[in-house]
């Protein structure tokens, strides 16, 4: 009798906890769906000025009408010459992406962010390609203007990732723009892109931009 009561009680508690967890998740999803439209623009243009967010950048013509467009930026207290080496060595199996490696590697991307300049990856050329994971897209260098712009496009043409360096009086603006097309996405997939992938991309890209900036500033200080 006591054993059955204990078992029933444990089952009841587990059911109650599961119900609470489901209710909490539903509430969190509902809140995001309700509030995200109010801060979506901030999410997609974090750190960028109005001019940077709306102005033209190299690579825009490679995907004229994206479904998703983000432009994010940081100010770096270093010249473009101290930022550029970190950009050209980025990638899986290279210098990583300077973001949360453990999250990247959950998706099998093989990212290991370097804290030093790797000479073997400094000779990037137009046409070079790198695959993001075993089944991920292949990104190929399409535009390379040293210390000014680096633009990659996926071989399927649905993703353009552009980096621009804009000198200022005392530093450099580092701008990252993503143009993404999802032509065959279902309504559910588009909703997931909006409410899950966009905020997630901000978390990862913010870390990346700040990480590049910190490394560049350290390099500039070292002379």
Where are these regions (language model features)?
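Short amphipathic, positively biased membrane-proximal segments
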Residues: 1-69, 73, 81-82, 164-173, ...
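Glycine-rich portal/gate segments that line the openings of hydrophobic small-molecule binding cavities
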Residues: 56, 63-64, 75-82, 88-162, ...
């Amino acid at each position: 009798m006591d054993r059955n009561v204990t078992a029933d009680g444990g089952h009841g508690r587990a059911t109650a906890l599961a119900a609470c967890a489901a209710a909490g998740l539903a509430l969190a999803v509902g809140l995001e769906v309700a509030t995200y439209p109010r801060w979506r623009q901030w999410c997609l243009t974090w750190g960028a000025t109005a001019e940077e967010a709306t102005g033209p950048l190299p690579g825009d013509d490679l995907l004229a009408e994206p479904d998703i467009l983000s432009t994010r930026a940081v100010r770096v207290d270093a010249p473009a010459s101290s930022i550029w080496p970190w950009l050209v060595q980025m990638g899986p199996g290279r210098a990583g992406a300077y973001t949360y490696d453990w999250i990247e590697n959950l998706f099998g991307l093989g990212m290991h962010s370097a804290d030093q300049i790797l000479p073997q990856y400094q000779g990037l050329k137009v046409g070079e390609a790198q695959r993001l994971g075993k089944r991920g897209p292949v990104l190929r260098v399409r535009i390379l203007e040293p210390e000014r712009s680096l633009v990659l496009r996926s071989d399927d043409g649905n993703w353009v990732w552009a980096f621009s360096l804009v000198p200022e009086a005392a530093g450099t603006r580092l701008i990252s723009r993503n143009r993404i097309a999802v032509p065959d996405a279902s309504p559910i997939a588009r909703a997931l892109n909006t409410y899950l992938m966009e905020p997630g991309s901000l978390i990862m890209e913010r870390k990346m931009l700040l990480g590049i900036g910190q490394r560049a500033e350290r390099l500039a200080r070292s002379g």
